[in-house]
A protein has these predicted regions:
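Conserved ABC ATPase signature
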Residues: 135-139, 143
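Helix-to-loop junction immediately C-terminal to a conserved catalytic motif
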Residues: 49
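Short beta-strand immediately N-terminal to the Walker A/P-loop
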Residues: 31-32, 86
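Conserved ABC transporter NBD signature motif
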Residues: 59-69, 116
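Conserved structural motif at the start of ABC-family nucleotide-binding domains
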Residues: 2-4, 18
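ABC-type ATPase nucleotide-binding domains, specifically the catalytic core motifs of the NBD
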Residues: 12-13, 31, 52-55, 97-116, ...
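The feature captures the beta-strand-to-loop junction immediately N-terminal to the Walker
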Residues: 34-36
Length: 151
């Protein structure tokens, strides 16, 4: 279960962005976060995925945990290992590169782990394995989204 309790985020030590945000998401559930512009959706997601830094004072209060384990101070790469990820609206792939080249340009992974991670992605999305050498720009929209998630 993902649990966010009493999250507070302040930018530049003066701008209160979020206050008292609390919710729980049962394991295995897929959710979307809806709200008006400027309501803090992206800030909540960035907090959960480790892209806001508690050390720099961005997250000033609250706890984010997965299955009871506090991840508030964890790096994004450790949070991904817990099964927490963000799917961006834009696909953010390089159309002129192959599927494999796009996956190699992935995230915060050491170079020795890249082959293993690529294999994991291709196991998750077998359709990409069949198209791994082709240019990403020729993938369908759904396949491009799978590639973006894999990256």
């Amino acid at each position: 279960m993902l649990s966010v309790q009493n999250l507070e985020v302040v930018y530049q030590d003066v701008i209160l962005v979020l206050r008292g945000v609390s919710f729980e998401i049962p394991k295995g559930k897929i959710v979307s976060l809806l709200g008006s512009n400027g309501s803090g959706k992206t800030t909540v997601i960035r907090s959960i995925t480790g892209l806001l830094d508690i050390q720099n004072g961005d997250i000033t209060k609250g706890t984010i945990s997965v299955d009871g384990e506090d991840i508030t101070n964890e790096k994004p790469s450790k949070i991904v290992e817990k099964g927490i990820a963000q799917v961006l609206e834009g696909r953010r792939i390089f159309a002129e590169l192959s599927v494999l080249e796009n996956l190699r340009l992935g995230g915060h992974t050491s170079s020795k782990d890249i082959p293993q991670n690529i294999d994991r992605v291709l196991d998750l999305f077998p359709i990409l394995k069949d198209r791994s050498k082709g240019e990403a720009g020729y993938l369908s929209g759904g396949e491009q989204q799978m590639l973006a998630i894999g990256r």
